[in-house]
Design a protein with these regions (language model features):
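An acidic helix/loop motif centered on a single conserved Asp/Glu
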Residues: 1-43, 157-160, 166, 170
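Short, low-complexity, polar/charged sequence segments that are solvent-exposed and flexible
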Residues: 8-14, 44-47, 81-85, 100
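Phosphate-binding glycine-rich loops and adjacent basic patches that engage nucleotide phosphates
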Residues: 9-16, 41-45, 121-134
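Structured segments of extracytoplasmic/periplasmic soluble domains
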Residues: 12-23, 52-59, 84, 168-181
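Short, solvent-exposed, polar/charged sequence segments at loop or secondary-structure edges
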Residues: 25-63, 68-78, 146
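C-terminal/domain-edge helix-coil "capping" segments
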Residues: 75-76, 87-195
């Protein structure tokens, strides 16, 4: 049994977000450093999410969990992700650490769970599934090194590349959900990168 390296998986998501035109993502190490400074080992609720967003001065936070992990062929990767967005008109001032001693909604900018702005996506990518393999083939075209021994099949045998593929698909799904939530039109209703 192989343990999941959560930081490596999160880095795949950061990399994929950075490739979306118009989006910027803070480096994972900066987010982890901010969490350590706040005494957080994870983001367990919206209060913590909004506190972290204010500390980072970020517009949103992508949270996720790995739901399936098998790094041996046939590869299997599953994840659930969500984006928590800062509410319109929310307080963008840097977090005053004294506020952390007052755990009320008002002390974190008035955010509460009844006004949470979120979009979610989840999937399981199974290396035995015909649907997954077809989507993986479309994704790997032009991305694989043609001079490597495994070529495009590298995405079927290397968990790091398979996870990158999963991150791409999940983020595409998440962007489509977020666009629908915000009423932003997408070309053909899809959040696809232009080649």
């Amino acid at each position: 049994v192989s343990a999941v390296d959560g930081a490596a998986v999160a880095d795949r998501f950061v990399s994929e977000i950075e490739q979306v035109e118009g989006l910027r993502c803070l480096p994972l190490n900066r987010t982890l450093a901010a969490m350590r400074s706040l005494g957080m080992t994870g983001v367990r609720d919206l209060t913590q999410a909004y506190t972290l967003m204010r500390t980072l001065q970020a517009d949103g936070l992508v949270l996720g969990t790995v739901t399936e992990w098998d790094p041996y062929k046939p590869l299997r990767f599953g994840a659930a992700i969500e984006v928590v967005s800062a509410a319109e008109g929310s307080d963008r001032r840097p977090l005053d650490l004294k506020e952390l001693t007052m755990p009320t909604a008002e002390s974190i900018g008035g955010q509460d769970s009844s006004r949470a702005a979120m979009s979610q996506a989840s999937r399981i990518f199974d290396g035995r599934s015909h649907e997954t393999l077809q989507e993986l083939e479309r994704y790997s075209m032009g991305r694989a090194a043609p001079d490597s021994g495994s070529g495009e099949r590298a995405y079927e045998i290397r968990i790091d590349l398979f996870t990158r593929f999963g991150a791409f698909v999940l983020l595409r799904d998440l962007l489509e959900q977020e666009a629908a939530r915000l009423g932003v039109p997408l070309v053909d209703g899809k959040a696809e990168r232009v080649p």
